[in-house]
């Protein structure tokens, strides 16, 4: 990946699958001994192509794991939801563990995705821990599941691999806005005022581009005398976005060394990852809005320069010339892990690591005096943002393995300490010299206005943990796993610093029983588990009281006037005051998630058909939420508390199947797929509606779109039901039949969360040719097309703004008709996507006279996002699931979302 790794699909069907090594919390186990729900994907089965995020490698591959793109921007985040959404404000993303190092989800890194620093070409495998038995050993950060990323290590004879690829990306489909001729007719037809500059401009063509992607990865690996092994790599990626002025560059380096001494009793792992990421972004919201609403009769250019708009606003082509948003992130993740065998079966291990990330982000407008309708752009602006973050981890573990005849017992005990420090400094400047020098390179102390705003913040969080695990197996038939973790976090109050997270799991390898000797099952294992995990992804310091100093600035009613006398006009009348901005809550507790899982693993037809079936029930309780005080005399408007009775429930089924053909012959194949059904709802909520999504824009700001509603699905859309247009005005359902349509006539009309998540794949080998296909999809979800509501009302068409047919679908609709939040803008979000297809050809070096130079030569062609089957009218049904409303996760709202690209790549892989 990210340079198109060699396709090497293993099709040998035998019991080796049971001996497959799976990464679990603080260790490894054979697949046959696993009692929890763990899904694994090796590097040879990753999705191919331009990949910025490890989540993209897995999309469509795993049951129970919904992976969606927040947007199509290069480096955009991936929302990874494991077994349903289980929290409101305290984080919905899994814990990421990279080579044993626990990442901090709150460290954002580059302006988009905190995992951009990892080169996907360096990853050997990804294991997803789904049930509480597998995740409870990680305690307070495991309620949303755990994603364990293991990078490549060296083995065998020395080898050099060079992977090169290049390709192009483009906008798959344009929104069907009017061309100039149709636009002229439609503006007149609705009785509007036509502004006609005699042009014929397709603004979607003007503001998008065919982006070029270039990738290069060089790696070296090997081992010597079973005492020393190494893997070293360098990577380069340069990816243009499909919007102009959109680009991601990443320079990466990786070094993994394993050294053994004392006759193999001492083993030391060194891991080093270094990266530099440069992320260039356009003014996305403005660009998306302009390219679908700008008057098509306005020529893009006049006399070689972007045409001045009649509104005195910025021509978006001019905006691209003077606007720049560049974030540069430098990151180093380094760890050392020595382990020493103290006695037979007894091993001590130290894991020490540091993750340092520093981001500099400059958002600037060069001065452009001709603009009068866009704030301070005419003078030039600069926002300079500095975000250094440090994550230090020290872990000590002691493990013991004991075996006697049919009994096998393994103990693990450990202590972990993690120190997380996040800083942020933002400075805003206004007024720059209008010359060829960018504002960020000018002397800010000489600007017309010194820093107009400055903000500085720093937080430190500490986490101390004690954990243990016991694994017992009898005769390779009966398996028991028990784990326990105690986490103490500085985020919580003095009365509840520690949370306690136990789990237990049972397994039965039925095929090892005597009565199964002649069974058609090659493998049959039954699993059951129950456990409790936690969630501490909440803002820092919220258990502590905070205060604000208020002082008189200028004049009566000044914003900074001490509130006891808002009419004060002199400095000697209440000049200073201290007020509460947050109440202390030393009783704030951990949010917890309890999960029950029943599973079956099976294999048939000499291990050619393998599969898993799981039922799970996940209940999140003790919900953490910022609430309004019950006492109206409280000195603050909100404070953080646990909602004792409220629960979020996710129940579901998972099915995953994989089939390998007979490995004999020149043609072989592998097909597989997975499907997940999830039923979720909010239970015993004391609130009528907890808003997760609210409208934005003129006349609609704050109007509820979706939220958490008692006994309804998560992300339930709550709005008026649109029936049509009568006498020029929208008609809505009178739900309670009282003859009036008011707020209480709003109803739940669907959910943004899909009921079914599915994916399927196929790999075909014929002689030296290989073809791989990967599909993914969702069903049962809705999308609110906020773009339609904001940009395509008939009234805006009448003002010479472009629209689609959506604006004129009701000819008798008046220009004064309000476009309120309703099912008029709610659409089916179901889709099926061919997200990846790769055709590869392996050249046998010996047959072309290159056997002495190369071990392998492979050419490949890859397509990404090749087609989408959907009824959704927007750019793409995967929308901005990464946004928040008041700190609560928002789902299923499409508002000016950056479109996903369609990409084609050619690649060359050389192994020396």
Question: PLM ranges: what are they?
Answer:
Residues 180-199, 288-318, 363-380, 423-454, ...:
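Surface-exposed loop/turn segments flanking beta-strands in extracellular/periplasmic regions
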Residues 222-224, 240-252, 265-287, 330, ...:
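Small-side-chain secondary-structure face that scaffolds active or pore-lining regions
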Residues 154-158, 225-227, 262-267, 345, ...:
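Short loop/turn motifs that connect adjacent beta-strands in outer-membrane beta-barrel proteins
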Residues 171-173, 197, 201-203, 207, ...:
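Flexible loop and strand-edge segments within Gram-negative outer membrane beta-barrel domains
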Residues 161-196, 425-428, 542-557, 660-752, ...:
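Conserved small-residue
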Residues 1-273, 333-334, 546, 590-591, ...:
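Short, small/polar-rich motifs associated with maturation and membrane association
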Residues 98, 195-225, 229-237, 305-341, ...:
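Outer-membrane beta-barrel transmembrane strand signature
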Residues 193, 448, 489, 727, ...:
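Extracytoplasmic gating/loop element in the C-terminal half of outer-membrane beta-barrel translocons
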